[in-house]
Each structure stands twice: as C-alpha cells, then as structure tokens.
C-alpha cells in the first residue's frame, strides 16, 4: 500500500489487485504494476480476452436461439404462440429498459473518469508551475548575485585598494556572495527534461478528450437504438425493428470489446494504485536522473525523511547573515572616509535585500508540502474518481451487452408477429402492451367520456 500522507488505496483497488494475473501459458504473473514488461502485458490481455470469450458465448446463444426459432416456430399451436408473443414483447421492453439504465450508469461513469483525469492534469500543471518557479527564482537570484560581483563589488575593491582592512571585508563579502550563488545553483534539481509535467499533462488531456468523446458517441448510439427499438415495437414498424436488430448486433460487438478494455484498465490501474510510490520513483528517476533522496522527500513528505536541501539552505542563510554584518560595518566605518563607496554599498545592500526575499520564497517553494499535495491530488483523481468511473463504465458495458443479446434474440420473433398487422388482430393477446386493437379501444373509450 502507498505510504503517501493523505492517500490510501480504496477497497475496490485492493480487491481488483488480488485478481489472478495469468499469462498466455496459464502461468501466474506478479501483480506489481509493470506495463513495460511483456509478461505483465500478457496478463492484462488475458483478462481482456475474457470479454472475447463472453462475446463468443453470446453469439453461440444467439445462433442457437435463432435456429430454434426458424425451425420450431411453425410447430407451436395458437395459444402457445399468443402467450409467447406477449412474453417476447415484454422481454424486448425489459431489455431496452435495462439498457437505458446501463446508459445512465455509463454517463455517470464517463463523467467520473473525466473528472479524475482532469484532476490529474490539473495537479501536473500545478507541479510544473512550482518547478518552473523554483528554476526561475534560482536563475534570477544567481544572475543578480553574479552581476553584483562583476560590477559593484569589483568597484568597491578598487576604491578600498589602499585600505587593507576594508579590502579584506569586501573580498570576504565577495566570497560569501559567490558561495550563495553556488549553493543556490546546486539546488536546482529539475532541469526541464522531456517529458516534463506540463507536457505529460497535455498528452494525458489529449488522450482523455478522445476517450470521453468516444464513450459519449457510444452512449448516444445505444440510447438511439433503444428509443427507435421502442418506437418500432410500439408502432409495429417492421423495417425499423429489423434495422435496429442489425445495428444492435454491431453494438453488441462494441459492448463486449469495451468491456474487455475496461476490465484490463481497471485491473492495471488497481495494480498501480495499490503502490504508486515505487513506480513513480523508478520511472521519474529513470527519465530525469533526479537524486532518489529528493524524490523520496517529495513523495513521502513526512518527518522520517530529511530535507535534502537543508544543508545548502542553512549555509546560504549563514552567508547572507555574514554579508549583512559586513555591509553594516562598511557603512559605519568606510563610508565616512570613502564617500564615493556609498552608492556601490547601497546597490549591494539592495541586492542583499532582494536576495533575502527570494531566498525565503525559495525555501517555501522547496518545502515538500506543495509538490506532495499535487502528487496526492493526482493519485486521488486517478485512483478514486478515475477508478470509480471505469468500474461504472464496466458495468455499463456488461448491462449493454446482456441487453443487446436479449434484444437480438427477441426482436426477430416480435417483427414476425406484426408483419401482417393490417390483416387481422384476432389472434393477438389482449395483454400485449403494443396490441393495436387494445390501443383503438382505449382511444374510443377516451372519446366517449
């Protein structure tokens, strides 16, 4: 489980993480998240192939039912046919209602997944902003210190060249300034390698936009099929029901296919979310070559992990204090004797004030709480909202596949019964919800009131 403060793997993550991981040779594979390794990829593909097996079973059931329908329908008596027509019609209606319920679940799951991915991209952009701010603050401060060393401190050395005690103080100040610049330059741990957090956020957002749109189109397609199927049954439009039956067959393939993809994604995501710290550390270090101590500091952010920048920050703080003391002594003792040095000392003092302000801002940015919060928010978005959304999408695909399987089996019998609806209605069951005679009686009864 993750040791990150503020994140704990959910119970559904734990359950999915315990799903057996088996490769194509039916050998058990380690469930540690390793998408770059072929055995782990085989395990996810094996899970996805379960949906393919379900598709094959549903196709066999459909074929068996249709063969039985074509061969045995003529042998049924009138009472049996009438009763079966009513059952078939209600079966179609029930399948459509279940499919509509699944569509509602799918819309919710798609929205939850999108919210989770949006939280991930937002956290990545925040982290990128923090890292960029650290680099800019360090580079600006180092440039400011270097410019003061090249100009004002060099001029002060020339002014105090004949006074050894003042010259020693200026040279000590120069060494302290150079030391601060060196310490700050070594703190900059993120050199902006690709992919940086912002580039990763853009890539994730790009993929999510197309994923969200694809599911919206699939959900709308399912909804349109359900509505037109109900319309065809209610109006007894044979050609419309036939078209919806054919389209339902293709959507059945999409439903089982999406279910396989969602099943593999859910299990893979649970493997990552059960222990994200190790994978994030290994991948980040492999890509960026950042010191492992720095990564551990920001990922864990607890009292057991020491701040890797503490020594450099402490040395820089002491150097700034020494510079302040030396400048105060020069202003008190040297300015009365060398009035021309006052302007340069004021410039150096302004540099010191600016550097101290930047230093305190840098200390706040380097604190682990900011980047760790972004890290935890990204984990929560991916492993809470994202995982929940994928599970709801998985349920949608399953309900949709079952509904379309039932509809494909039921609709042929339904359209066969109302193909001659204009000829005779006497053999239709009165309990049929779409009986035209019953509809006419209801209209006549309303008009007589």
From Swiss-Prot:
<keyword id="KW-0813">Transport</keyword>
<dbReference type="Pfam" id="PF04906">
    <property type="entry name" value="Tweety"/>
</dbReference>
<keyword id="KW-1003">Cell membrane</keyword>
<keyword id="KW-0868">Chloride</keyword>
<dbReference type="GO" id="GO:0015813">
    <property type="term" value="P:L-glutamate transmembrane transport"/>
</dbReference>
<keyword id="KW-0869">Chloride channel</keyword>
<keyword id="KW-0472">Membrane</keyword>
<dbReference type="InterPro" id="IPR006990">
    <property type="entry name" value="Tweety"/>
</dbReference>
<comment type="similarity">
    <text>Belongs to the tweety family.</text>
</comment>
<dbReference type="GO" id="GO:0072320">
    <property type="term" value="F:volume-sensitive chloride channel activity"/>
</dbReference>
<keyword id="KW-0812">Transmembrane</keyword>
<feature type="topological domain" description="Extracellular">
    <location>
        <begin position="260"/>
        <end position="388"/>
    </location>
</feature>
<feature type="site" description="Essential for the formation of the channel-pore">
    <location>
        <position position="163"/>
    </location>
</feature>
<feature type="transmembrane region" description="Helical; Name=4">
    <location>
        <begin position="239"/>
        <end position="259"/>
    </location>
</feature>
<feature type="topological domain" description="Extracellular">
    <location>
        <begin position="108"/>
        <end position="212"/>
    </location>
</feature>
<feature type="transmembrane region" description="Helical; Name=3">
    <location>
        <begin position="213"/>
        <end position="233"/>
    </location>
</feature>
<feature type="topological domain" description="Cytoplasmic">
    <location>
        <begin position="410"/>
        <end position="449"/>
    </location>
</feature>
<feature type="topological domain" description="Cytoplasmic">
    <location>
        <begin position="234"/>
        <end position="238"/>
    </location>
</feature>
<comment type="subunit">
    <text>Homotetramer; disulfide-linked. Homodimer.</text>
</comment>
<comment type="function">
    <text>May act as a calcium-independent, swelling-dependent volume-regulated anion channel (VRAC-swell) which plays a pivotal role in the process of regulatory volume decrease (RVD) in the brain through the efflux of anions like chloride and organic osmolytes like glutamate.</text>
</comment>
<feature type="disulfide bond">
    <location>
        <begin position="273"/>
        <end position="383"/>
    </location>
</feature>
<feature type="disulfide bond">
    <location>
        <begin position="301"/>
        <end position="368"/>
    </location>
</feature>
<feature type="topological domain" description="Extracellular">
    <location>
        <begin position="1"/>
        <end position="43"/>
    </location>
</feature>
<feature type="transmembrane region" description="Helical; Name=2">
    <location>
        <begin position="87"/>
        <end position="107"/>
    </location>
</feature>
<feature type="topological domain" description="Cytoplasmic">
    <location>
        <begin position="65"/>
        <end position="86"/>
    </location>
</feature>
<dbReference type="GO" id="GO:0005886">
    <property type="term" value="C:plasma membrane"/>
</dbReference>
<keyword id="KW-1015">Disulfide bond</keyword>
<feature type="glycosylation site" description="N-linked (GlcNAc...) asparagine">
    <location>
        <position position="282"/>
    </location>
</feature>
<keyword id="KW-0325">Glycoprotein</keyword>
<dbReference type="GO" id="GO:0034707">
    <property type="term" value="C:chloride channel complex"/>
</dbReference>
<keyword id="KW-0407">Ion channel</keyword>
<feature type="glycosylation site" description="N-linked (GlcNAc...) asparagine">
    <location>
        <position position="353"/>
    </location>
</feature>
<feature type="glycosylation site" description="N-linked (GlcNAc...) asparagine">
    <location>
        <position position="128"/>
    </location>
</feature>
<protein>
    <recommendedName>
        <fullName>Protein tweety homolog 1</fullName>
    </recommendedName>
</protein>
<feature type="transmembrane region" description="Helical; Name=5">
    <location>
        <begin position="389"/>
        <end position="409"/>
    </location>
</feature>
<keyword id="KW-1133">Transmembrane helix</keyword>
<feature type="transmembrane region" description="Helical; Name=1">
    <location>
        <begin position="44"/>
        <end position="64"/>
    </location>
</feature>
<keyword id="KW-0406">Ion transport</keyword>
């Amino acid at each position: 489980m993750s040791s990150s403060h503020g994140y704990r793997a959910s119970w559904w993550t734990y359950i999915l993480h315990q799903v057996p991981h088996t490769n194509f040779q039916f050998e058990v594979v380690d469930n540690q998240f390793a998408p770059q390794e072929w055995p782990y990829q085989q395990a996810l593909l094996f899970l996805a192939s379960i949906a393919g097996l379900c598709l094959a079973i549903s196709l066999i059931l459909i074929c068996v039912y249709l063969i039985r329908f074509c061969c045995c329908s003529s042998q049924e008596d009138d009472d049996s046919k009438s009763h079966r027509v009513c059952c078939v019609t209600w079966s179609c209606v029930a399948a459509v209602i279940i499919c509509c319920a699944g569509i509602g679940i799918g819309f919710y799951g798609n929205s939850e997944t999108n919210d989770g991915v949006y939280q991930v991209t937002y956290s990545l952009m925040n982290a990128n902003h923090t890292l960029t701010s650290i680099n800019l603050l360090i580079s600006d401060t180092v440039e400011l210190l270097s410019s003061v060393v090249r100009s004002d401190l060099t001029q002060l050395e020339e002014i105090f060249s004949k006074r050894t005690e003042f010259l020693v103080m200026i040279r000590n100040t120069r060494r302290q300034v150079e030391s601060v610049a060196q310490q700050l330059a070594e703190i900059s741990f993120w050199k902006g390698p690709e992919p940086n957090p912002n580039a990763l956020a853009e890539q994730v957002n790009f993929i999510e936009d197309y994923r969200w749109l694809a599911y919206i189109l699939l959900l709308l397609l399912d909804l349109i099929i359900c509505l037109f199927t109900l319309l065809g049954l209610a109006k007894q439009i044979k050609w419309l029901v036939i078209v919806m039956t054919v389209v339902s067959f293709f959507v059945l393939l999409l439903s089982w296919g999406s279910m396989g993809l969602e099943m593999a994604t859910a299990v893979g995501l649970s493997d990552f979310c059960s222990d994200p710290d190790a994978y994030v550390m290994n991948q980040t270090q492999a890509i960026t070559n950042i010191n492992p101590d720095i990564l551990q500091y920001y990922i864990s952010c607890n009292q057991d992990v020491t701040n890797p920048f503490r020594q450099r920050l402490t040395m820089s703080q002491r150097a700034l204090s020494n510079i302040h003391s030396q400048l105060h002594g020069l202003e008190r003792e040297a300015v009365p004797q060398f009035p021309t040095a006052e302007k340069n000392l004021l410039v150096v003092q302004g540099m010191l004030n600016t550097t101290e302000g930047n230093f305190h801002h840098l200390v706040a940015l380097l604190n682990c709480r900011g980047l760790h919060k972004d890290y935890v928010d990204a984990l929560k978005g991916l492993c809470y909202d994202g995982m929940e959304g994928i599970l709801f999408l998985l349920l949608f695909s399953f309900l949709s596949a079952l509904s379309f399987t039932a509809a494909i089996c039921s609709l042929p019998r339904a359209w066969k019964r109302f193909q001659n609806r204009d000829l005779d209605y006497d053999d239709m069951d009165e309990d049929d919800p779409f009986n035209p005679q019953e509809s006419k009686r209801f209209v006549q009864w309303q008009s007589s009131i």
